Structures are given as C-alpha cells and as structure tokens.
Amino acid sequence: MNYISLFSSSGIGCFGFKQNGFECIATNEILTKRLKIQAFNNKCKYDTGYLDGDISTKEIKNKLFTEIKKWQTEHKILEPDVIVATPPCQGMSVANHKKTQDEIIRNSLVLEAIHIISLIKPKVFVFENVAAFMNTKCGKDGEERKISEAIKEELEDIYDFQTQVINFKDYGAHSSRS
C-alpha cells in the first residue's frame, strides 16, 4: 500500500501510515526545514518524493504527477492508495480568536487538496484537522462556502465519504485538542 501526504509539516499527520508499512510516493510541505525532518526519517522511497514548495503552484503539482507516474511505471500501481491532507488550521481553529486575513485565506488551501484528490482519484482520502474544519468557510474567486460543501461538490460523484471527529487523547496522545 502507498500514500501521498499534502501539507505534511514534519510528517506527523501520516506517521501511522509509514509505521504500518505504507510506502510514501510523495510528501509536500512549504517549509523546507519541516521537509528535511521527513527526509531525515526516510519517509519517502525516492529523494524526488520530497516536494518542497506551495502546492497551489503548477511546478509542485507537476512534480507530484511525475512521482505518481514513476510509481505507476516502476511499481505497477494504477493509482495511489491514500492521500492524506493536513491543511493549515490557524484560520479554522476556535482557539485562534484573533484571526488575520492571511490566516483566513489559508483556509482556501484545502481547495487545492480537494482538486488534487479529484484528479488523482486515490482509493481513499483523509483530511486531518481541527473539529471546526468541515464548517469553516473557504473561497476561491470571491465565492465562499463551507469546506464540507466544497468536498461534496467536487468529490461526491467519485466517493462515498463520512466525517468523524476523533480526539487523539482517546488513542494515547497526551493532550486534548478539543
């Protein structure tokens, strides 16, 4: 089994996939120092799988599709098994009462992940974020809608999906984020 990680920070959001034998096709993070942590931990099979930059740019998307094609050729996969996306939560978190316009604009990065999922069509996709994630408004070209509506509009013809709020404290984490 394999996966792609978007907005992956230092790789914690998909650590369980790697720990359970999944192979990383590609991982994307905008901050180089965070991606270096993933490389230090040998997250991806190939060095070219570490995609350093903004996922909304054509350059990074092209690198992502190049990695997928490499795996289709060398590993005979049809499509990735999983895409896990952990978009920035600063503009979504109820703990952040002083949201700036930049943080709110970051909410719309999730639209990039939704669109990439619709193009790649992995067997499964996972969004990990704060409890308010699905009700947070995002927008593109002046049109605002809830993230849940954006997911439904772009992915409901391809996937059956469900949402669930999980508190990782119930699974061994030492703090609660709810």
Question: Model-flagged regions — what are they?
Answer:
Residues Y3-K58:
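SAM cofactor-binding core of SAM-dependent methyltransferases
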Residues I4, V82-V84, V126:
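N-terminal Rossmann-like NAD(P) cofactor-binding module of classical short-chain dehydrogenase/reductase
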Residues N41-V82:
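Short, structured active-site "lid" loops
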Residues L64-P80, Q90-S178:
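Class I S-adenosyl-L-methionine
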